Design a protein with these regions (language model features):
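Solenoidal tandem-repeat scaffolds enriched in leucines and small polar residues
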Residues: 1-30
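Conserved beta-propeller blade signature
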Residues: 20-23, 64-66, 121-126
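Structural motif
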Residues: 30-38, 72-84, 132-138
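Short loop/turn segments that connect beta-strands within beta-propeller blades
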Residues: 40-44, 85-90, 140-145
Length: 163
C-alpha cells in the first residue's frame, strides 16, 4: 500500500503502539519544516503534527519523542520534546510524566535516542555529543528524575535496544 502523507523526507526509526505508528518527516532542511505523522494502521488515517519526531518510542499508549530540526540556512540544530496520547492523538509539549527530564535533555549537546523500559518504566536518553567524542546514556525514573549517567567509550549511542 502507498499512503501519501504530503510530508517530505520520511526518515528515521518508527515506533509502534498497537495499531498506531509514529513516523518522522525531516522536511527539506531549508524551507519545509520537519513534521511528525501518526498513522492508524487499522484504517490508513493519519494525523500530521507541526513538530519533528526524529527520536521516538512508544510506552503505555503514548508516543514520546525528541525532535531534531536542522537548518542548512543557519547550520544549527533545534531540539524539542513532545508526547502524543493514544488513541485520542492529543499532542502536548514535553514528555508527560517524565517532564522533569526535559531540562537535562534540552541541555544535551546532541540528543540521539530515547527508550522507555516496559519492565521498569525508566526512560533512557542518549547524548551523542559529537561524532568524535564518547557519548552518554542518561537514565531517568518514572517521574523524570535523573538516576544515572553512563559514559560510553568509543561509541556514539545512536540506538537503545533491550535485550
Amino acid at each position: 500500500r502507498r499512503i501519501d502523507t504530503g510530508c517530505k523526507n520520511l526518515y528515521g526509526i518508527m515506533s509502534q503502539s498497537g495499531q498506531y505508528i509514529c513516523i518522522n518527516s525531516a522536511g527539506d532542511m531549508y524551507h519545509i519544516p520537519p513534521r511528525c505523522i501518526v498513522l492508524n494502521m487499522a484504517n490508513d488515517e493519519f494525523r500530521v503534527y507541526d513538530f519533528p519526531a526524529t527520536y521516538n518510542c512508544a510506552y503505555h499508549n503514548r508516543f514520546y519523542m525528541i525532535g531534531s530540526s536542522y537548518s542548512y540556512i543557519t547550520s544549527t540544530y533545534t531540539y524539542s520534546a513532545h508526547t502524543i496520547s493514544l488513541p485520542s492523538l492529543e499532542a502536548s509539549e514535553g514528555l508527560a510524566d517524565y517532564n522533569a527530564a526535559n531540562e537535562t535533555i534540552m541541555n544535551m549537546q546532541s540528543p540521539y535516542a530515547i527508550y522507555i523500559s516496559p519492565l521498569s518504566g525508566h526512560m533512557y536518553v542518549s547524548d551523542a555529543r559529537s561524532y568524535a567524542t564518547n557519548g552518554y546514556v542518561y537514565e531517568f525514573d518514572r517521574q523524570g528524575v535523573q538516576l544515572k549517567r553512563y559514559l560510553l567509550r568509543g561509541v556514539n549511542p545512536g540506538r537503545i535496544i533491550a535485550m
